Amino acid sequence: LNGGSFSCFGNITGVDDPTLKSDSWSAGDGLLGIAYNSVIENAIGGSASDNVVGNGVANTLYGGAGSGVKDTLTGNGGADIFVCSLSDATTDLSLADSISDFTDGTDFIGLEDRTYSDLSILNSSGDTKIIDTNSSKVLFLLDGVDHTLIDSSDFIITDFV
């Protein structure tokens, strides 16, 4: 969200969307605005597939509860924390949550119920795949990130979820 502007969610496309003027909208549809000079630093998606986008400040972003749905997280600058939990992980790589702009040395992956020693860091067609070793579930895909750059310094323990 950017101060003084609107963000749409669900099936709503903008402030002039005809759905807003009818009785056809439903839970999960909406339009949200915040005041000028306001900055939101944390965002949590819902239980479906979400595209959660931060702003230029240090954001903490979490795709929301639900395994088997693909969330995409984008920090958009700042030293961001991308939160993951084993309960959201999946064995289906096509449904794994992804981080579209992870910056090694600046951003962090926040682990809710894991530690770095629980993980395997692997190559996946030029992306980095972060796996819980015990369950073989994928916690995150880091789009376009060389897996050899990722080490324990990229992870922190969080209590966000």
Identify the role of each PLM range:
Residues 1, 84, 111, 141-144:
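Hydrophobic residues in beta-strands and at strand termini
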Residues 1-78:
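Extracellular repeat-rich scaffold modules on cell surfaces
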Residues 3-29, 37-41, 119-161:
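Low-complexity acidic/polar repeat-biased segments
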Residues 44, 86, 134:
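Short, histidine-centered active-site or binding-site loop motifs used for metal coordination
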Residues 49-117:
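Acidic, glycine-rich calcium-binding repeat modules characteristic of RTX/beta-roll
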